[in-house]
Amino acid sequence: VALDPNTGGIQGLIGRRGEYTFRGFNCAISMQRSPGATIKPISVYAPALEAGYKPDSILKDEPQSYYEAKNFDGTYQGEVPMYEAVAQSLNLPAVWLLNEIGLNKGFNKAKEFGLPLTEADKYYGLALGGLEHGTSPAVMASAYGIFANGGTLYSPHLITKIIDSTGAVIVDKTQPKGKRVISKETSEEMTSMLLGTFSNGTGMSADPYNYTIAGKTGTTESSFDTTKSNDQWMIAY
């Protein structure tokens, strides 16, 4: 999915692989999947910044008694600055920080970002993308558009305007109304950390030559073999 973060207008999408099927299932819009670690900036780091944390705030990187989680390589450092936890997509600091700011704060902020959460999602798995029903690529793209445009949510849409044969306007999204979700300062601080994903983090191998991009990677483990993944996400701007 490619969309304009300043309007929510979808510029392009691939709905499925293989031959075109008329009115076939569109994975980009209708598929509900766990977003993996791409949820961390939404449910943990953005609300933490809003609560007064800074990119260089020190986070605990160690096992916790209230939720069983581990980092992707099975190691931990004890303490790490937030910007490193974001770039390296560390799981333990994300869970610890969600506990520090409070489940309600992370849950409510993620809903403000447009994620279709239910009460069943209000647990520590929210820090790692473990959702009851999941979300779609289109919703996640619009959520990251909030970081790209300075803090405002614009709902993703495919149609800009419809005028019927009588000249009546049926749909008009030429000037869509956005909703403020985070402050401009928070969006800028989040972007500064998401740049690290491609400069020295989990997205280094995907860093495009001669372009500067910010974003986040995400992987969901297979329930049958934890060494393999079901989905691999990349969201960038």
Spans of model-derived segments:
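Active-site SXXK
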Residues: 8, 34-59, 85, 143-147, ...
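Short, well-structured active-site flanking segments
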Residues: 25, 39, 48-67, 101-107, ...
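Glycine-rich, acidic and aromatic/proline-enriched surface loops and short helix-turn segments
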Residues: 2-19, 50-53, 78, 87-91, ...
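Conserved catalytic neighborhood of penicillin-recognizing serine enzymes
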Residues: 53-106, 167-196
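Mid-domain, small-residue-enriched loop/turn segments at the edges of structured enzyme/sensor domains
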Residues: 70-71, 102-142
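Flexible loop/turn segments at secondary-structure boundaries
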Residues: 9-11, 18-21, 66-67, 93-94, ...
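A penicillin-recognizing enzyme superfamily signal
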Residues: 1-4, 13-14, 20-29, 136-142, ...
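Extracytoplasmic/periplasmic, Sec-exported soluble proteins
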Residues: 2, 30-39, 51, 74-78, ...
